[in-house]
From Swiss-Prot:
Its main location: membrane. PROSITE patterns: IG_LIKE (PS50835). It is found in: Cell membrane. This is T cell receptor alpha variable 8-3. V region of the variable domain of T cell receptor (TR) alpha chain that participates in the antigen recognition. Alpha-beta T cell receptors are antigen specific receptors which are essential to the immune response and are present on the cell surface of T lymphocytes. Recognize peptide-major histocompatibility (MH) (pMH) complexes that are displayed by antigen presenting cells (APC), a prerequisite for efficient T cell adaptive immunity against pathogens. It comes from Homo sapiens (Human). Residues 21-113 form the Ig-like domain. Gene3D superfamilies: Immunoglobulins. One of its GO terms (biological process) is adaptive immune response. The keyword Amino-acid biosynthesis does not apply. It holds the Pfam family V-set. Residues 1-20 form the signal peptide.
Length: 113
């Protein structure tokens, strides 16, 4: 069975200060087989140490927080078997799952704040 992970969108936030940040998700549409591993890329632009988030939106549902990074350990464990690794040198926070299920078919959003 093939899973389709619906188009990924970059989310842009502006803090209360004049400094802006942005997120880019280069993978527009990904199809994987059930049981295969998954990596969704997220690159950010931010001057200081960012707060990073991954959200999922399943069909007909609201956004659900998968995981977040504030500081400390760069490998973050989330819900539903997802994890993400913060790599400051690459300005990335890629979402991974070792074995996807059909129920993982959804839209995934990376955010910085």
């Amino acid at each position: 069975m093939l899973l389709e992970l619906i188009p990924l969108l970059g989310i842009h936030f502006v803090l209360r200060t004049a400094r802006a940040q942005s997120v880019t998700q280069p993978d527009i549409h990904i199809t994987v087989s059930e049981g295969a591993s998954l990596e969704l890329r997220c690159n950010y632009s931010y001057g200081a140490t960012p707060y990073l988030f991954w959200y999922v939106q399943s069909p007909g549902q609201g956004l659900q927080l998968l995981l977040k990074y504030f500081s400390g350990d760069t490998l973050v464990q989330g819900i539903k078997g997802f994890e993400a690794e913060f790599k400051r040198s690459q300005s990335s926070f890629n979402l991974r799952k070792p074995s996807v299920h059909w129920s993982d078919a959804a839209e995934y959003f990376c955010a910085v704040g």
